[in-house]
UniProtKB/Swiss-Prot annotation:
Part of the 50S ribosomal subunit; part of the 5S rRNA/L5/L18/L25 subcomplex. Contacts the 5S rRNA and the P site tRNA. Forms a bridge to the 30S subunit in the 70S ribosome. Transmembrane segments: none annotated. Belongs to the universal ribosomal protein uL5 family. This is Large ribosomal subunit protein uL5. SUPFAM superfamilies: RL5-like (SSF55282). PANTHER family: 60S RIBOSOMAL PROTEIN L11-RELATED. This is one of the proteins that bind and probably mediate the attachment of the 5S RNA into the large ribosomal subunit, where it forms part of the central protuberance. In the 70S ribosome it contacts protein S13 of the 30S subunit (bridge B1b), connecting the 2 subunits; this bridge is implicated in subunit movement. Contacts the P site tRNA; the 5S rRNA and some of its associated proteins might help stabilize positioning of ribosome-bound tRNAs. The lineage of its organism: Bacteria, Pseudomonadati, Pseudomonadota, Alphaproteobacteria, Hyphomicrobiales. Keywords: Ribonucleoprotein, Ribosomal protein, RNA-binding, rRNA-binding, tRNA-binding. InterPro entries: Ribosomal_uL5 (IPR002132), Ribosomal_uL5_bac-type (IPR020930), Ribosomal_uL5_C (IPR031309), Ribosomal_uL5_CS (IPR020929), Ribosomal_uL5_dom_sf (IPR022803), Ribosomal_uL5_N (IPR031310). Pfam families: Ribosomal_L5, Ribosomal_L5_C.
Length: 185
């Protein structure tokens, strides 16, 4: 007898409540028209890694701890003399989360990490891109519980992009609000 597959809390909530609420609000005719989360991209730019290669690897290790999935180091494509940057130098790291890991990360972001941000007054509601995707920046990655504060050499910022299948920003905002994203009024 096979055991039931694990379903993240937010995915179960989406299937049970959010999908029906969105259908009522926007009047979708088909279940496949209802917007859903597609992926979450975490990006950490490390400008200091031009001088020290290990900084990009350290950032990738910390991003791997935060995401629960291996982060890849990103390299420069062109040389820029003003930044003392040569081609193929490590300049950051990124990771793309989908399915169960994506829902788990969003759950941790909304319930644990964002309340730990200093002077947090809510997320900017104008950070949608016009196609239903939302981007936010975090100044210190140490707000995540996976990072050991004592072992961190320096606090780094990171970009988080939440990609949805929504066609408009209004639909995407309704979806993210249903997932308890704390937008400013």
């Amino acid at each position: 007898m096979a055991e039931a597959a694990y379903t993240p809390r937010l995915r179960a909530e989406y299937d049970a409540k959010i999908r029906t609420a969105m259908t009522e609000k926007f009047g979708y005719e088909n279940v496949m028209q209802v917007p859903r989360l597609d992926k979450v991209v975490l990006n950490m730019g490390v400008g200091d890694s031009v001088n020290d290669r290990k900084k990009a690897e350290t950032a990738a290790a910390e991003l791997t701890q935060i995401a629960g999935q291996k982060a890849i180091v990103t390299y420069s494509r062109i040389a820029i003399a003003t930044f003392k940057l040569r081609e193929n130098q490590p300049i950051g790291c990124k990771v793309t989360l989908r399915k169960a890991r994506m829902y788990e990360f969003i759950d941790r972001l909304v319930t644990v990490a964002l309340p730990r941000v200093r002077d947090f007054r809510g997320l900017n509601p104008k950070s949608f891109d016009g196609r239903g995707n939302y981007s936010l920046g975090i100044k210190e990655h140490i707000i995540f519980p996976e990072i050991d504060f004592d072992k961190v050499t320096e606090a780094r910022g990171m970009d988080i992009t939440v990609c949805t299948t929504a066609k408009t920003d209004e639909e995407a905002r309704a979806l993210l609000t249903a997932f308890n994203f704390p937008f400013r009024q």
